[in-house]
Amino acid sequence: TLRRTLQHEAFHQFAQVAFEHELPPWLNEGLAQIFEEAIWTGDSFILYQVPPRRVRLIQAGLANDPQIFADLHDLAALTTADWSDAITGNEGLGQLRYNQAWALVYFLARQQDANGNPYLPRLLNLLQKIDDGFAPVNAFDSVFPDVDELQDQFFEFVQSLRPTPQALLIERQQVLADFVAQLWERGQHPADINQARRALKRGKYQLHYRLGSVRWDSDSDVSTYFSDGEGHLFSTSALRFNRIARQLPPDILCRAAPRVVLHTHFFQIGGRLEHETLVEQTSLQRKVIPTALD
């Protein structure tokens, strides 16, 4: 989406100002994607989100070829020119390189080595060395002399990667919005969430998605998209419609936690019905208005 693109490019602008020397492409793009996937709540970011689409793309690639990711030392040695030359005109390789860069930065920021020591201090040390003028590949080798162990741990990590709860709920609400849009375009205008669920179950609706070479279907049980992360149906106060414009589907408002709200609104572009899901974080000090999802 445009919002994710802006967050991604904003990091690149920040990096140009914050670092005296250019970051290697895997690190620059990996960090940019960490911010791309972050949830903006209106006044802060919720970082380190793992969206389901990333998991699908990465694990589908690994299932087809367990050696599909580049050797980490080779990845660290890529210059910006190498990176650009390799992915220009090759969408599949470009998608692969970006996903590997994202996964590696996420791994280094969030995981521990075999001795239980967080990798994050070493990632910060790597950034400092590059900023001090070390050649990126030399900085990588000095910070990660145990690259074979790192490679093995990273491979295990990406194989077991799972979506974060917040990102999973956001995707589910986006799928629910796709369902509501289909009902609306077929002349069915449910007055509330329960009517929408009954209409979808009665019509045995299912959606089909594709991203690159990866295809997936919506859950055959549409109740999934009316439920929380533990599979319990939301109450009508936690998940509801809010009518804004008569010519458009109602906004979908869902509160999944005390302070966070998902708010999906619909709009038209060129006669096509589109939607966007925003995340709002409410303050405990003020009245909580049920117009967003936690």
Give the predicted meaning of each segment.
Residues 1, 20-192:
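Acidic/His/Gly-enriched intrinsically disordered linker/tail segments
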